[in-house]
Amino acid sequence: SSSGSFFSSDAGALSAPDEKKEPEEEKGPDLTGLALNPLTGLYIDEETALNRPAAVVINNHHKALPQSGIAKADILYEVLAEGEITRLIAIFNDFSAEKIGPVRSARNYFTYFALDNGAVFIHHGGSPSGYEAVKARSVNNIDGMREEGSLFWRDPKRVNMAGMYEHSSYTSAEKILEGIKKYGYDAEDTGIRLFS
């Protein structure tokens, strides 16, 4: 019969053609000049990937809003500071943020976020146990209490508003790099990485 079933021998129209095509080799993206960001696993500029990260304590109180620079952070932790008040620990590998803050004080356990990411710890002041932890754990740090007016500045709009002084300390990526150089800290990646 001329109407064969799929399983019959005359279903030749369904058989594979005689000529075999070689599969085309897929080309991946051009990764020239790129390297893995050790914090995110995403590709970034090779030189940027070599930066040592900075861990900045940023105020998360409702009076501190809006914060500056957090969109440039590679990792953003929200951590309890006291009571129901939280702070952000922003980890930066890319030093392009022009304004970061408001920067707040060190707490004992905040130092672990810097150490775990091989980062320089950036804060403005600290609790007694925060300062003890920085010293006891040999945490490379830049403190706004020592560097106000040079590596840190007060936002003029906030500093003159009632109840806003503690929400007015800022720094920048450029100032953090200046501080790393000033204190003689290693500016290159310390080898602690989430991605490699």
Where are these regions (language model features)?
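Sec-dependent N-terminal signal peptides of Gram-positive bacterial secreted proteins and lipoproteins
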Residues: 1-4
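A surface/extracellular/periplasmic glyco- and lipid-processing/surface-interacting theme
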Residues: 6-14, 25-77, 82-196
